[in-house]
Regions:
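Long, well-structured alpha-helical subdomains associated
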Residues: 130-173
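Catalytic zinc-binding patch centered on the HExxH motif and its immediate surroundings
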Residues: 29-60
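An active-site-proximal "capping" alpha-helix that borders the catalytic cofactor pocket
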Residues: 113-131
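Catalytic Zn2+-binding segment of zinc metalloproteases
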Residues: 74, 83-99, 132
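Active-site His/Glu-centered metal-binding helix of metallohydrolases
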Residues: 79-88, 119, 123
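Bacterial N-terminal signal peptides
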Residues: 7-17
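Post-HEXXH active-site segment of zinc metalloproteases
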Residues: 90-117
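Short pre-active-site segment immediately N-terminal to the catalytic Zn-binding motif
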Residues: 63-77
Length: 173
């Protein structure tokens, strides 16, 4: 029963990363992103909570529909966080640094990933403060605490580190 859903999600996902802009407009739902003017897609069955990338040299953000449904406040933090990766130049650095590398590209940028995540979190907090969304900041801090001492992703800071960083940035701005 679940196989047709997975096949459809795979086709949609492939269309997002390989298809034309028109195909995306017709098939993939978008969501209003109040934190930046970057097209933000809502994708079911996305293995990540959210991600930032480029599509035909255009910045895009993809957010998990499941994550948004579970917590719209945390989803808003993720949108601000992913906007930050674009505005801080992280996506461009990633593309520039990995464009010429072989089969293990993460090896080359792993040292930068921790710093990029903390910077994106802090910039997201700044944007959320500007939009007067303190509850969104607190929800994000609480979500990070759920990771505890475990990394929140490959080569990422731990949940405790990210929660402390979010609190520091909230006090700063």
């Amino acid at each position: 029963m679940r196989l047709p859903v997975l096949i459809i999600a795979a086709i949609l996902g492939l269309g997002l990363f390989c298809g034309s802009a028109l195909a995306k407009q017709l098939w993939l739902p978008t969501i209003d992103n109040p934190y930046c003017a970057i097209t933000t897609y809502l994708l079911p069955d996305l293995p990540e909570q959210a991600l930032s990338t480029m599509d035909n040299d255009h910045p895009i953000i993809v957010v998990s529909a499941m994550t948004m449904a579970q917590s719209s406040a945390y989803g808003r933090f993720l949108m601000a966080h992913e906007c930050s990766h674009h505005t801080l130049g992280h996506v461009a650095v990633y593309k520039r640094e990995l464009g010429h590398l072989g089969p293990q590209p993460f090896f080359y940028i792993a040292p930068q990933l921790r710093h990029m995540e903390l910077d994106a979190d802090c910039n997201a907090v700044r944007m959320l403060k500007i939009k007067n969304e303190p509850e969104t900041i607190e929800v994000a801090r609480q979500m990070m605490l759920q990771f505890g001492g475990k990394p929140t992703g490959a080569y990422y800071p731990t949940g405790i580190e990210r929660a402390a960083n979010i609190a520091r940035c909230a006090a700063k701005y």
